[in-house]
Amino acid sequence: MGEVLWDLLPDGKILGGAPVNFAYHAMQLGAVGVAISSVGDDELGREIIDSVNSKGVENCIAVNNYPTGTVGVTLKDGKPDYTIYENVAWDFIELTSGAIQKLQQADAICFGTLAQRSAV
């Protein structure tokens, strides 16, 4: 539960956000992985939902009126430097009834530290 976003690298974008990465890897180990987050009602948000679905991760990703989250990634001396943008969709995660049901059924929950900057 938490941020789902696009890491914008100099050579393209990569699906990111620790919680969705955790859900994917948990699923690879035989667990049920569920992504709970929010994306914007925009092309980047639709691409995130498609990408999460194509990876086989169950999703409870709500769509809201904020832009889909992105993180700018640049390399300085071979090391990544991140620009994390605020007031994006995952800053305002809507807990849908489906998401609440998945949380109640969960054996473990991974939540992102970035999402802790907002009330949800």
Language-model regions: role of each:
Residues 1-57:
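Glycine-rich phosphate/adenosyl-contacting loop at the front of the ribokinase-like
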